[in-house]
Amino acid sequence: MAEKQTAKRNRREEILQSLALMLESSDGSQRITTAKLAASVGVSEAALYRHFPSKTRMFDSLIEFIEDSLITRINLILKDEKDTSTRLRLIVLLILGFGERNPGLTRILTGHALMFEQDRLQGRINQLFERIEAQLRQVLREKRMREGEGYTTDKNLLASQLLAFCEGMLSRFVRSEFKYRPTDDFDARWPLIAAQLQ
C-alpha cells in the first residue's frame, strides 16, 4: 500500500516537473495542452487525469509550491535578520533568485503561463504578490520600532515600489526568453533601489 502511494506521489511530481520544464521551453509561451504534457511525461491523457482531475489542478499544485517556497523563506529571513535594509534586500533577492532558478515557474509568476487558463489561477498569483507586499510593508513599518528611526515616505508606496522592481525584473527575464537573469548586476542595482527608501 505504501509503495503504491509513493509511486503515485512520484508520478504526480514527474507530471509537475514536466509541466514546469515545458513552461521553461518555447512551448511555455503557448498554451500547453494535456496531450502535449502527456506525451512529455510518456503517459496517456487518461493517466494524467488519474493523478490530477484537471490541468487547472496541476497549475494549482505548482502555485502552491511557489507560495510555500517564497513565504517560508521570507519568514526565515524575518526571523533571522533584524536590520531593516538587510531584510528588504534579502526578500527582494529571494524573489529574483527563485525566479531565476525556476524559469518555468516564473512564467506563472508573471502571468504569461496563465493567460490561457482559468482566471482563478491568476487570482492566486495576485494574492501571493499581495501577501509579499504586505510583508514588505510590515518590515518598513517596523523600522521605527527596531531602529528608532522610520521612513518619511509612505510605507505603502515604498513596498509597492520594491515589488514593482521584482515584477519588472521577472517580466524582463520571461520576455528575453530567460537571457536576462533577474539577479544580474543586483549588487549594483540594490543601492539605487535602497536610495529610494527614505
From Swiss-Prot:
One of its GO terms (cellular component) is cytoplasm. Belongs to the nucleoid occlusion factor SlmA family. It is found in: Cytoplasm, Nucleoid. Pfam families: SlmA-like_C, TetR_N. GO terms for molecular function: DNA-binding transcription factor activity; transcription cis-regulatory region binding. The lineage of its organism: Bacteria, Pseudomonadati, Pseudomonadota, Gammaproteobacteria, Enterobacterales. One of its GO terms (biological process) is negative regulation of division septum assembly. PANTHER family: HTH-TYPE TRANSCRIPTIONAL REGULATOR RUTR (PTHR30055), NUCLEOID OCCLUSION FACTOR SLMA (PTHR30055:SF183). SUPFAM superfamilies: Homeodomain-like, Tetracyclin repressor-like, C-terminal domain. Homodimer. Interacts with FtsZ. The keyword Ribonucleoprotein does not apply. InterPro entries: DNA-bd_HTH_TetR-type_CS, Homeodomain-like_sf, HTH-type_TetR-like_transc_reg, HTH_TetR, NO_SlmA, SlmA-like_C, Tet_transcr_reg_TetR-rel_C_sf. This is Nucleoid occlusion factor SlmA. Keywords: Cell cycle, Cell division, Coiled coil, Cytoplasm, DNA-binding. Required for nucleoid occlusion (NO) phenomenon, which prevents Z-ring formation and cell division over the nucleoid. Acts as a DNA-associated cell division inhibitor that binds simultaneously chromosomal DNA and FtsZ, and disrupts the assembly of FtsZ polymers. SlmA-DNA-binding sequences (SBS) are dispersed on non-Ter regions of the chromosome, preventing FtsZ polymerization at these regions. Residues 10-70 form the HTH tetR-type domain. The gene is slmA. Residues 117-144 form a coiled coil. It comes from Salmonella typhi. Residues 33-52 bind DNA. HAMAP family: NO_factor_SlmA (MF_01839).
